[in-house]
Amino acid sequence: MAHGGIHLRQKRNFCPVTVSTVAVVFVVFMGVLVNSLGGVAVAADSGGVKQTPSETGSSGGQQEAVGTTEDYVNSSAMGGGQGDSLAEDDTTSEAAEGDVDPFPVLANEGKSEARGPSLEERIEEQGTRRRYSSVQEPQAKVPSKRTQKRHRLIGAVVLAVSVAMLTAFFLRRTGRRSPQEPSGDGGGNDAGNNAGNGGNEGRGYGGRGEGGAEDDRRPLHPERVNVFDY
């Protein structure tokens, strides 16, 4: 019964293959966990902005106009004035040539329509573009190299500490169970001694048996002894 208990205690010791397998699985699990947490933290911390694509489908996106509304109005007014001066020059040249239009108002209206949209329409269009360009959508930026290195360093430190703790734990458990091994050796020695004693006892009995056989050759009764035999 004692030998059976020793055998069970020895069987409970951890195999090196089992220890390495458990350590590798734990390290992989911790690495995946740290990597996923680092990616989520980077995505939450580094939030950027992105401009909406333009209505024409260009890849560059909608761009804001440079300058203020007053500058745009002044430039438009200057353009309109220049157009009017050009129209007046055309009318003056036609009048000089002798071909005068009897309805100059209608001619000017036709030229203004051909020239483009009015100033109010341009201002409204510019305001609409400003509203479109001011709309911004959050977008996760790619983490920088320094951030990636920092997260990799943190993951390596966590993995190293985990492996060291596992190794120390299993070594401590193995060290606690190692003093019980001499008791098993002593039991084996006792069994060997008992077997040796049994063999010696068997040899002794055999010797006694041989001695008895030698003693049986001598005459047991003196009456049967023949004097002439000696």
UniProtKB/Swiss-Prot annotation:
Consequence of substituting residue 180 to P: In strain: Castells, FOU, NED, RUB and TONT
Effect the entry attributes to changing residue 206 to R: In strain: Castells and FOU
Glycosylation sites: 74
Domain of life: Eukaryota
The UniProt record lists the keyword Transmembrane helix: yes
Polar residues composition bias: residue spans: 51-77
Pfam families named among the record's database cross-references: GRA6
Result of changing residue 185 to H: In strain: RUB
Disulfide bond annotation, renumbered to this chain: none
Transmembrane segments: 14-34, 151-171
Ranges for region Disordered: 46-150, 175-230
Effect of residue 50 to Q: In strain: FOU
Basic and acidic residues biased stretches: 110-128, 214-230
Effect of residue 50 to R: In strain: Beverley and Me49
Keyword annotations: Cytoplasmic vesicle, Glycoprotein, Membrane, Secreted, Transmembrane, Transmembrane helix
Effect of residue 105 to A: In strain: Beverley, MAS and Me49
Listed Gly residues bias regions: 184-210
Main localization, broad class: secreted
Protein's cellular compartments: Secreted; Parasitophorous vacuole lumen; Parasitophorous vacuole membrane; Cytoplasmic vesicle, Secretory vesicle
Bias kind Acidic residues: ranges: 86-100
One GO CC term, this protein: transport vesicle
Family membership noted in the UniProt record: Belongs to the Gra6 family.
Role according to the record: Major granular component involved in excreted-secreted antigen (ESA) immunity. May have a structural role in the membranous network of the parasitophorous vacuole (PV).
Record's protein name: Dense granule protein 6
Lineage, top ranks: Eukaryota, Sar, Alveolata, Apicomplexa, Conoidasida
